[in-house]
């Protein structure tokens, strides 16, 4: 199912421009923040000082707090319905079926993330099939925003870490290092991303650790070095996580997404996503 295609003043331009701004788009948002949480209208990377950056980080904290409360208040039955709808959309999508390699997050219930268990199970269900996809999942390396994406073949490859979040052991059952996607010889086609809040201009707000933005930048550098096409960046989102366009503050370190998968379907954001979806 394809959702409404809403375009902001070119997302490509946003990726390249040194000016970070928050346009007012005449579209009805799924969720509106109060005026007090809306970000500063314009920021230039050439004139930002620490005070301005601190202001953006403060705005991010306010948005995170608002969205966390909304997620916590979600009815469990509604959450289950949205989990099923989102995963069904992904599993039936041509861009998912055709991908040969991908990075995907392992959902954590305590973080109120969109469930990915059916997606992962489908990928790992037929390891010897011709349609098998090569799957890489997150392994947090340290507390300094360093994360790796390691290859797994079975759900049994996952163990709970100190925060009770499933992740791959860095070595397999035979004692061999797991393949790191940043050292792989072949590119991946797709990232399935988590997040705390999103808008239809491609802005993504994480949980504040910087792990995904740091990793995505590294993979983009790797792809550029190898001459590979960038993978499609697709985020999964419950309804309360989709904010009014321009409500999410951004910095030069924030990586934009290509598309959203919502309970209502797919929302392509970039021209590439429109072509693929």
From Swiss-Prot:
GO terms for cellular component: mitochondrion. It is found in: Mitochondrion. GO terms for molecular function: 5-formyltetrahydrofolate cyclo-ligase activity; ATP binding. One of its GO terms (biological process) is defense response. Pfam families: 5-FTHF_cyc-lig. SUPFAM superfamilies: NagB/RpiA/CoA transferase-like (SSF100950). Keywords: ATP-binding, Ligase, Mitochondrion, Nucleotide-binding, Transit peptide. InterPro entries: FTHF_cligase, FTHF_cligase-like_sf, NagB/RpiA_transferase-like. Residues 1-48 form a transit peptide. Substrate binds at residues 113, 207-211. Monomer. NCBIfam families: MTHFS_bact. This is 5-formyltetrahydrofolate cyclo-ligase, mitochondrial. It comes from Arabidopsis thaliana (Mouse-ear cress).
């Amino acid at each position: 199912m394809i959702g409404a295609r809403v375009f902001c003043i070119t997302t490509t331009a946003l990726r390249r421009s040194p000016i970070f701004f928050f346009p007012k788009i005449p579209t009805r948002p799924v969720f509106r923040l109060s005026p007090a949480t809306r970000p500063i209208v314009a920021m230039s990377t050439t004139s930002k000082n620490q005070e301005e950056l601190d202001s953006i980080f403060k705005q991010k904290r306010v948005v995170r707090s608002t969205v966390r409360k909304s997620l916590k208040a979600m009815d469990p039955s509604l959450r289950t319905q949205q989990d099923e709808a989102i995963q069904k959309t992904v599993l039936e999508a041509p861009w998912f079926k055709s991908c040969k390699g991908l990075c995907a997050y392992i959902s954590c219930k305590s973080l109120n993330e969109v469930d990915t268990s059916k997606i992962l199970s489908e990928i790992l269900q037929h390891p010897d099939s011709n349609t098998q996809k090569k799957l890489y999942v997150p392994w947090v390396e340290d507390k300094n925003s360093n994360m790796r994406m390691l290859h797994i073949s079975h759900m049994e490859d996952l163990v709970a870490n100190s925060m009770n979040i499933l992740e791959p052991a860095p070595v397999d059952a035979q004692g061999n290092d797991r393949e790191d996607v940043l050292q792989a010889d072949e590119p991946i086609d797709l990232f399935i991303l988590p997040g705390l809040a999103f808008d239809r201009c491609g802005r993504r707000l994480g949980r504040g650790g910087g792990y995904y933005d740091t990793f995505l930048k590294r993979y983009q550098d790797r792809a550029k070095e190898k001459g590979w096409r960038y993978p499609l960046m697709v985020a999964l989102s419950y309804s309360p996580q989709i904010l009014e366009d321009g409500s999410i503050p951004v910095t030069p370190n924030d990586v934009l997404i290509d598309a959203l998968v919502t309970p209502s379907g797919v929302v392509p954001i970039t021209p590439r996503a429109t072509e693929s979806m």
